[in-house]
Each structure stands twice: as structure tokens, then as C-alpha cells.
A protein has these predicted regions:
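Residue-level detector of the transmembrane beta-barrel scaffold of outer-membrane proteins
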Residues: 17-19, 65-67, 96-98, 129-135, ...
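Noncatalytic modules at the cell exterior or secretory-pathway interfaces
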Residues: 12-16
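A charged, amphipathic interaction segment
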Residues: 149-171
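Transmembrane beta-strands of outer-membrane beta-barrel pores
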Residues: 70-76, 87-89, 101-107, 118-120, ...
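Outer-membrane beta-barrel initiation region
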Residues: 2, 8-10, 21-124, 160-166, ...
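C-terminal outer-membrane beta-barrel translocator/porin domains of Gram-negative envelope proteins
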Residues: 131-144, 155, 198-324
Length: 351
């Protein structure tokens, strides 16, 4: 009888690999870890196989997938042409990596990303997954201006082990975001041209149920020049007539700040976040006029209109409400209260 662990000594008969359940007589969901090469090299436990597009994994090979890329990320890079190379198959696996070099037509530059991570999965407990790794991205954020973002991270993911059908997920994430901007000709934003680093902690509790959606998170950021704390709560309900009602509450405050007066890059934004951590998919992040400057991203203040006082360097609170009338036609209303240094709190609204 085999207990939790037992060692076996296998005679060395010049075998090149050892296989458990070779004839698959014992039912198993995941057979990938039944193979062990006798070469002792964990990176080449199986021969490499190259495939276009994601496919069902082979038990006999380590597979690399090639996916051609034709995409549009922003107006500065324009059309991106390249290749995504990764080892992510249909089933989860511990070690994952991906690299995506692309040529950006408008910026005439090589951009893209690279990511490597390691996953540990747990059964029959609320902590279901721990993953850590590093990601690097390089792209344009303005004309003739590039940003390199380096992020080592670790995530702890939770779910109800007694109800695996539940859509509720929780996560605690830690990351250290390094931003380095490369200005070729841009002369604005000089104050933030030097590299900066931000340590970010975020706890998320989300239920992605289609009918009763809710999500809240608590976020803390720390750097040499500032510390911030913010809270976001959002609920969405669907009626029997297929109408949606959405309510969102946001509050954020600086814990400390050494940011020079007049510098708004790290302030709380009422309607259009500055995105100094480059987390949002702006089509034209550096635009101040035109259609791309009006791109709507619901974050921070979440306002839909541009107001005279759009930033807060002390604290900001807001309430956003919206309801669908017909398909994608909605009505909305926003109210907020913000505070800047040396000024009284300001009440703002739009609809």
C-alpha cells in the first residue's frame, strides 16, 4: 500500500525515460507529469516541438506555440506586425513564458513584451493559486516617445473551495513597477522624464455573475515621492427586461507627497487618469485635443465630462451611476468632492 510518499529504486537499464501509466489503464485528467527523462535536465525533459496556434498538448513533447500578430494598440505605434511565442497550452502548467516582438509601423520601432511566471496550484483549500514572475513591455505613449515598464510581481488567488461553481474570486497582489521614459523630441512632461518606481499592493474581491456583478478593491502605492491609498466599489444589476443599473463609489487620498507644485502626473484624476503606471489601454494617451483625447476609461473619478478642475493632489471622492435605456444607450450621472493643497474642497457633478 502506497501512502502519501514512497521511494522506488529503478534499475539503470539504459532507459532514456520513465513513464507512469504508460498504457493509460488508470483514469487520469492530467498525464503530462507522468514522464521523466533520465538525462537529468529539467528544461529538456521532453523533446521540443514547434506549432502554430494553441493546440491540445502532446504527452511526448514540450511544445512552443507561434501566433502571428497583426494588431493596433495606439495611434503612435500604429499597426503592429510580429509574432507571439509562448508555451501556454489548454491546461494549466507551472512554468509559463511568452515573448512578443513586433514592428510598429508608425513609430518605425521594435516594441512588444516579454513575460515569465511560475504557478503553484492548491486543491481543497481557499488559496487556490500562487503565481510570481516578471513582465517587461516597451511601447510608444506619445509621438517619438517610448516607455519601458518592468514589473516583478507575486499574486495570491483565492476562491471558495466548497463551491467551485461560484464566480467569486479574491486576490492579493504585490508588484514593483519600474517606469523609464525615452523622449526623443517631446519637450512636455519634463518633470517625470527621469525613471520612477512604485510599489503597489492591491486586494480585489469580485463576483463576475452576469446578473449580480460586484467588485471592490483596496489599493496602496508607495514611491520615494508619494504614497496613495484608494478604494473602489462597483455593483451592477440586470433587470428582467434586460436593463442594467450600475453604481460605483471611489475614494482616494495621498498619505504623503513630495511632488513639486504644479506637477499633475501623479494626481488623482476626475475624468481622465494620467496612467503613470501605464495600466490602461489608451489609444492616444498624450492627446489633449481631438477624438482620442475623449476616450472614456472608468477609473479614479470616473467622470464623463471635462471640468475646469480635473485633478486633486490631496484627496478625491466620487459617485458614478448609470442605467441602460435601450441596448447601448445609457443615462449617467456623476458627483464628486475633491481637495487640492491650499484650496477648499470643491463639489463637482455632471450628467
Amino acid at each position: 500500500k502506497i501512502g502519501a510518499k514512497k521511494q522506488f529504486v529503478v534499475p539503470n537499464n539504459l532507459a532514456d525515460k520513465l513513464v507512469l501509466n504508460y498504457d493509460q489503464k488508470v483514469p487520469e485528467f492530467d498525464l503530462r507529469n507522468n514522464w521523466k527523462s533520465t538525462s537529468g535536465n529539467p528544461l529538456f525533459n521532453k523533446p521540443l516541438q514547434f506549432r502554430f496556434f494553441k493546440d491540445v498538448e502532446s504527452l511526448h513533447d514540450n511544445q512552443l506555440y507561434f501566433l502571428p500578430i497583426i494588431e493596433f494598440r495606439n495611434i503612435y505605434d500604429g499597426l503592429n506586425l510580429g509574432m507571439n511565442i509562448n508555451n501556454k497550452g489548454v491546461l494549466n502548467k507551472p512554468f509559463l513564458f511568452g515573448i512578443s516582438p513586433v514592428y510598429s509601423v508608425n513609430s518605425n520601432a521594435l516594441t512588444g513584451f516579454a513575460k515569465v511566471g511560475y504557478n503553484t496550484y492548491f486543491e481543497d483549500q481557499n488559496l487556490c493559486n500562487i503565481n510570481f514572475g516578471m513582465a517587461i513591455t516597451h511601447s510608444s505613449f506619445a509621438e517619438n516617445a517610448f516607455v519601458t515598464k518592468t514589473v516583478p510581481y507575486v499574486n495570491f488567488n483565492f476562491r471558495d473551495a466548497t463551491n467551485l461553481r461560484s464566480n467569486e474570486l479574491k486576490s492579493l497582489s504585490f508588484r514593483y513597477v519600474g517606469i523609464e521614459k525615452d523622449f526623443v523630441e517631446v519637450k512636455d512632461d519634463e518633470a517625470v522624464a527621469p525613471p520612477y518606481k512604485v510599489f503597489n499592493i492591491r486586494y480585489i474581491d469580485a463576483n463576475n455573475s452576469f446578473k449580480k456583478y460586484h467588485k471592490w478593491f483596496l489599493d496602496a502605492q508607495f514611491s520615494d515621492d508619494f504614497g496613495k491609498l484608494s478604494f473602489n466599489y462597483e455593483i451592477r444589476r440586470r433587470s428582467n427586461k434586460d436593463q442594467f443599473y450600475n453604481l460605483r463609489v471611489y475614494a482616494g487620498a495621498f498619505l504623503y507627497s513630495k511632488i513639486p507644485s504644479g506637477e499633475q502626473n501623479f494626481d488623482f484624476a476626475l475624468d481622465r487618469p494620467t496612467d503613470y503606471l501605464f495600466d490602461y489601454n489608451y489609444l492616444g494617451q498624450f492627446e489633449s485635443t481631438g477624438s482620442f483625447s475623449q476616450q472614456l476609461i472608468i477609473a479614479e473619478g470616473g467622470f464623463k465630462s471635462k471640468l475646469d478642475t480635473a485633478f486633486a493632489n490631496e484627496w478625491l471622492t466620487s459617485l458614478n451611476a448609470s442605467a441602460s435605456i435601450w441596448k447601448y444607450v445609457q443615462v449617467y450621472g456623476d458627483i464628486g468632492l475633491l481637495k487640492n493643497k491650499g484650496n477648499n474642497p470643491l463639489f463637482v457633478y455632471d450628467a
